[in-house]
Amino acid sequence: MAVGKEILTKIRSVQNTQKITKAMQMVSTSKMRKTQERMSLARPYAEKVRMVMSHLAQTNTDHGIPLLESHREIRRVGFILITSDKGLCGGLNANVLKKFLAQVQEYRNQGIEEEIVCLGSKGLMACQSIGLNVVASAVNLGDTPKMEMLLGPLTELFQRYEKHEIDRIHLVYSGFVNTMRQEPRMEVLLPIGENVIGDSAPKSPFSWEYRYEPTALAVLEYLVRRYLESVVYQALSDNMASEQAARMVAMKAATDNAGNAIKELRLVYNKSRQAAITTELSEIVAGAAAV
């Protein structure tokens, strides 16, 4: 019964793995819900900031703020690449990296260089492995990242845009659609589009005249930074919800596969045990007949 013992050992090993994947599935489900709640709470803030910023930009057209400049000749681009810090989330990071690398290659074909800020260790390791120009990074952000953890890398990139050392900034992340679907997204963060500060931007439902302190221009300059930071944080929350959803689905599939493997191993074990018993009975019968 040496074979039978080996099969039982395999069954116990798969059962232990199944317990781990089941626990990870439950943890990911809980984390996904919490991340979705944070996303919902952050949206109203971002919308209000955008609305006030749009009003100020339209009433102060000669603001002279570099972050609100548009129509630049593209010579150098920046990327904010958001990925997860951990694996076991299916093809989530691979899909984001595929979209990101395709855009990088397209720019390189036009002779345009790139500078990259990586948020998440998976993206950082991928960029370093192929020799891309990573200028700043933030990794090990945890399940509830603070904005302060992102300010250093983001400020580096925004300052380079203000100095005209970068002419466009892309934001790349995995967008959360639903539990079963996450899609890689790439958005132009800078220059800020007409849908944010132009005539097509969302308007306040009130037509009051606002008075700003110390000045409208100072408030606008402050809000532009807060708006950009809120967009990046929203994308990070989106990516984290996608990560937990993808991990939940992957761990459920692993748990189900482990269950199927256990059934197959039990079937093999029962067959081998039955064969061993049949052999023993045959030997007993043969021995009795010989007597």
Curated annotation (Swiss-Prot):
It holds the Pfam family ATP-synt. One of its GO terms (cellular component) is proton-transporting ATP synthase complex. NCBIfam families: ATPsyn_F1gamma, PRK05621.1-1. Its main location: membrane. The keyword Secreted does not apply. It is found in: Cell inner membrane. Keywords: ATP synthesis, Cell inner membrane, Cell membrane, CF(1), Hydrogen ion transport, Ion transport, Membrane, Transport. It comes from Neisseria gonorrhoeae (strain ATCC 700825 / FA 1090). GO terms for biological process: proton motive force-driven plasma membrane ATP synthesis. It comes from the Bacteria. Belongs to the ATPase gamma chain family. InterPro entries: ATP_synth_F1_ATPase_gsu (IPR035968), ATP_synth_F1_gsu (IPR000131), ATP_synth_F1_gsu_CS (IPR023632). GO terms for molecular function: ATP binding; proton-transporting ATP synthase activity, rotational mechanism. This is ATP synthase gamma chain. The keyword Cell inner membrane applies. Produces ATP from ADP in the presence of a proton gradient across the membrane. The gamma chain is believed to be important in regulating ATPase activity and the flow of protons through the CF(0) complex. It is a peripheral membrane protein. Transmembrane segments: none annotated. F-type ATPases have 2 components, CF(1) - the catalytic core - and CF(0) - the membrane proton channel. CF(1) has five subunits: alpha(3), beta(3), gamma(1), delta(1), epsilon(1). CF(0) has three main subunits: a, b and c. The lineage of its organism: Bacteria, Pseudomonadati, Pseudomonadota, Betaproteobacteria, Neisseriales.
